[in-house]
C-alpha cells in the first residue's frame, strides 16, 4: 500500500520548518474517524487533537515521544496527539479505528478528572478491558458524521462521548508517562 498523502492539519518530523500543534487548533474543528489498515509511518507527526486508536485484529506498535508503546488488539488507547507519534509496526493488523477528537470536545465531556489530567499532561492511556467497541459502530459513526442532518451528526458525537464515558468507568491505566511530568 502507498503512504497516506500529507495532511495539512498535521505536523511531521521530516518537515523543513516545524509548526506547533496548537497552531493547527483553529484550522481543524471537525471530528475525524478512519477505519483502515494501519501503515508504518516514515516519520513521527503531531497534531492538536486527542487521538484514539483501536486495532481490531492484531497488535500494533507506536513510537510516542521516543518511547515504544504496544497497543493490544481490541484495546482502546488514547493520547493527546501534540506528542510526536509514529506507527512503527502495524504487525498483522488489517483493521484499526483512528479517531481524531477536537480537544475542546474532549474537554467538554463528563469524564474522569484524573483521566483528563493524564491525557492533557502527555500520558498514553489504555483500556483495561478489550472489545468495548466494534467495527460496526465505527462505520456507523463515520457515515453519520458526514450526514447532512445536524441532529444525526450530533447523535454520533454524543455516542462517541458515551463510548469514552464507558472507557472512563470500565477501567484504564497509563501505559506511557510523560517524562517531563514526573
Tell me what each language-model feature is.
Residues 1-31, 84-148, 165-175:
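A hydrophobic/aromatic-rich effector-binding and dimerization subdomain
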Residues 177-182:
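DNA-binding recognition helix and immediately preceding turn/loop
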Residues 66-80:
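Short acidic-glycine-tyrosine-enriched beta hairpin
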Residues 59-61, 77, 81-87, 106:
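Histidine-centered metal-chelating micro-motifs
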Residues 38-39, 73-74, 82-84:
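Tight coil/turn sites that cap or link beta-strands
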Residues 146-162:
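All-alpha amphipathic helical-bundle segments outside canonical DNA-binding/catalytic cores
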Residues 1-63, 67-70:
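Generic protein-terminus/edge-of-domain signal
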Amino acid at each position: 500500500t502507498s503512504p497516506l498523502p500529507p495532511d495539512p492539519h498535521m505536523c511531521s518530523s521530516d518537515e523543513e520548518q516545524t509548526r506547533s500543534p496548537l497552531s493547527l487548533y483553529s484550522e481543524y474543528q471537525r471530528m475525524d474517524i478512519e477505519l483502515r489498515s494501519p501503515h508504518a509511518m516514515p516519520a513521527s507527526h503531531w497534531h492538536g487533537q486527542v487521538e484514539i486508536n483501536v486495532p481490531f485484529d492484531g497488535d500494533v506498535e507506536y513510537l510516542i515521544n521516543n518511547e515504544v508503546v504496544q497497543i493490544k488488539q481490541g484495546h482502546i488507547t488514547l493520547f493527546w496527539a501534540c506528542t510526536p507519534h509514529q506507527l512503527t509496526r502495524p504487525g498483522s493488523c488489517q483493521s484499526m479505528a483512528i479517531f481524531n477528537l477536537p480537544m475542546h470536545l474532549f474537554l467538554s465531556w463528563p469524564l474522569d478528572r484524573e483521566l483528563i489530567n493524564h491525557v492533557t499532561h502527555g500520558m498514553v492511556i489504555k483500556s483495561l478491558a478489550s472489545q468495548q467497541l466494534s467495527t460496526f459502530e465505527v462505520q456507523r459513526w463515520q457515515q453519520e458524521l458526514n450526514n447532512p442532518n445536524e441532529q444525526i451528526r450530533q447523535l454520533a458525537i454524543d455516542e462517541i462521548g458515551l463510548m469514552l464515558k464507558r472507557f472512563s468507568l470500565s477501567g484504564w491505566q497509563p501505559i506511557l508517562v510523560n517524562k517531563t511530568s514526573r
